[in-house]
UniProtKB/Swiss-Prot annotation:
Species of the source: Brucella abortus (strain 2308)
A GO CC term attached to the entry: cytoplasm
Summary of the function given for this chain in its UniProt record: Required for maturation of urease via the functional incorporation of the urease nickel metallocenter.
InterPro entries: UreF, UreF_sf
Main localization of the protein described in the UniProt heading: cytoplasm
Record's protein name: Urease accessory protein UreF 1
């Protein structure tokens, strides 16, 4: 059967697809993950809006957010060039630094793969159904011809928004604090998306060790709201 892939050169269509795929209501289960933030709050490392903003900006610039953006960009390029996606998928899975981080990225990736099939595309024939979330997002965006810079900016913003939503449930800040942080993070997201668009696999690397340790410690946390 021939699959017609709706490649878009229309910026409005690209925007609508990104808003749909990375919306908090897109069925990937992102609301159930805190990426270790819950443990950081529990241990007193993030106690207010200022600390939360600092936590997020370093995850994006030098932590798991950055690595995911690099993986997303490489997956986008593989999709655009018609290259095999299995190698990047295996690397992305191997980079998950803890059991819950692995669960978070793999379950979201699989859910994204399934839900995004509502937009038919040949990329689903080349993409492993069990793949990490940034690989799934990057490959699908590339398969549909969504511009890379826009895809990366939207991906990073969705990453932060999910943790901001978690911060409200954790009583770190309220809605006014969240909107202020969203506005303050715009330059960080734009700059990081631009860097990631020009990145290669050699640019992978993280320096947010405390955040990684919090994700590990969360695995044994007795009382919790989130799966990670």
């Amino acid at each position: 059967m021939t699959i017609i892939t709706p490649i878009t050169n229309d910026p409005t269509t690209a925007l609508l697809r990104l808003m749909a795929w990375l919306s908090p209501v897109f069925p990937v289960g992102s609301f159930s993950y805190s990426h270790g933030l819950e443990r950081a709050v529990h241990d007193g490392l993030v106690v207010d809006a200022a600390g939360l903003q600092d936590w997020l900006q370093w995850l994006v610039r030098r932590g798991s957010g950055w690595n995911d953006a690099v993986l997303c960009a490489e997956s986008w390029r593989c999709a655009m060039k018609g290259e095999d996606l299995h190698e990047i998928a295996e690397l992305a899975e191997a980079l998950a630094g803890s059991r819950e981080r692995h669960m978070e990225t793999m379950l979201q990736g699989g859910a994204f793969f399934a839900a995004a099939r509502s937009w038919p595309c040949e990329i689903f024939d080349r993409l492993p159904p069990d793949c990490a979330y940034p690989v799934a997002v990057g490959a699908v965006a590339g398969g549909h011809g969504v511009p890379l810079a826009q895809a990366l900016a939207a991906f990073l913003q969705a990453f932060c928004i999910n943790l901001l939503q978690a911060s409200i449930r954790l009583s770190v800040t309220g809605q006014s604090g969240v909107t202020a942080i969203m506005a303050a993070l715009e330059p960080v997201l734009g700059e990081t998306a631009a860097r990631a668009a020009l990145s290669s696999m050699e640019d992978l690397g993280s320096a947010t060790f405390i955040a990684d340790i919090m994700a590990m410690k969360h695995e044994t946390q007795h009382s919790r709201l989130f799966r990670s």
